């Protein structure tokens, strides 16, 4: 009996399974041809994979900086000398909102925003900034609810960490050459103090920064001068 030309030959089960695996893999790669539940699962897995990738990169950079960065090793050594050794476990990598790169908490240590760093240098500046806060908390017993105390540490951290170097300011859109460093330190200190729950207005933040500016801007401890 002649074969019906309109009928397709049936594939062996192993070939059919191989094709389905290929089709499913391609769909997951492109996002095309997926059901809504499959799309949601694909996005969940992508986000999960990105979190793991970001965390691995952040932890790797942290190890490198703790071992090889002159700035970071200097600050860690002086924290140890001050009686407050700062282990790797006190510097945690986590995802963060868009408007921050790190943070310091007396109770929890340093937050490194694993998904917000442009490069390792950005992370180095951020870690140095937070380690200055840690040093101040250890050495000077900062009362973080006191706006003048907070303002002083923010001035020192912005001044000493590299956070206000010219190239960073250019990326932020600030191009002035005359006293650019001082302007950056003051601007960023005011913004940080403004986020303090005890601060109720921009004017209050600016007043706190101005009141301690002279003594805190010139205080470069534990450095001999601005790095």
From Swiss-Prot:
> For this protein, what is the EC number?
3.4.24.-
Localization terms from the record: Mitochondrion inner membrane
| Molecular functions (GO terms) | metal ion binding; metalloendopeptidase activity
Extract one GO BP annotation from the record: mitochondrial proton-transporting ATP synthase complex assembly
> Is this entry keyworded Membrane?
yes
Q: Which domain of life is it from?
A: Eukaryota
Task: Classify the protein's membrane topology as the record does.
Answer: Peripheral membrane protein
Q: What PROSITE patterns has UniProt attached to this entry?
A: ZINC_PROTEASE
Enzyme active site = 130
The keyword Hydrolase belongs to this UniProt entry's keyword annotation: yes
Q: Which GO terms describe its cellular component?
A: mitochondrial inner membrane
A Pfam family recorded for this sequence: Peptidase_M76
Described function:
Has a dual role in the assembly of mitochondrial ATPase. Acts as a protease that removes N-terminal residues of mitochondrial ATPase CF(0) subunit 6 at the intermembrane space side. Also involved in the correct assembly of the membrane-embedded ATPase CF(0) particle, probably mediating association of subunit 6 with the subunit 9 ring.
PANTHER family in UniProt: MITOCHONDRIAL INNER MEMBRANE PROTEASE, MITOCHONDRIAL INNER MEMBRANE PROTEASE ATP23 HOMOLOG
Instruction: State the family named in the UniProt similarity comment for this chain.
Output: Belongs to the peptidase M76 family.
Q: What is this protein called?
A: Mitochondrial inner membrane protease ATP23
Q: Which organism is it from?
A: Cryptococcus neoformans var. neoformans serotype D (strain JEC21 / ATCC MYA-565) (Filobasidiella neoformans)
Taxonomic classification: Eukaryota, Fungi, Dikarya, Basidiomycota, Agaricomycotina
């Amino acid at each position: 009996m002649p074969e019906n030309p309109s009928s397709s030959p049936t594939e062996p089960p192993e070939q059919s399974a191989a094709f389905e695996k290929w089709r499913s893999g391609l769909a997951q790669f492109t996002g095309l041809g997926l059901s809504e539940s499959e799309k949601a699962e694909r996005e969940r897995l992508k986000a999960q994979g990105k979190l793991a990738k970001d965390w691995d990169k952040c932890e790797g950079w942290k190890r490198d900086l703790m071992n090889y960065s002159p700035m970071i090793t200097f600050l860690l050594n002086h924290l140890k000398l001050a009686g407050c050794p700062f282990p790797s476990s006190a510097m945690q990598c986590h995802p963060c909102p868009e408007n921050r790169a790190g943070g310091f908490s007396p109770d929890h240590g340093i937050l490194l925003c694993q998904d917000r760093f442009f490069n390792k240098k950005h992370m180095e500046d951020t870690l140095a900034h937070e380690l200055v806060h840690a040093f101040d908390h250890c050495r000077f017993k900062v009362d973080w609810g006191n706006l003048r105390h907070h303002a002083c540490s923010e001035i020192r951290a912005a001044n000493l960490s590299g956070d206000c170097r010219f190239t960073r300011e250019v990326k932020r859109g600030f191009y002035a050459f005359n006293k650019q460093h001082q302007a950056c330190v003051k601007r960023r200190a005011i913004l940080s103090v403004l986020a303090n729950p005890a601060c109720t207005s921009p004017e209050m933040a600016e007043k706190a920064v101005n009141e301690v500016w002279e003594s805190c801007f010139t205080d470069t401890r534990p450095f001999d001068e601005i790095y």
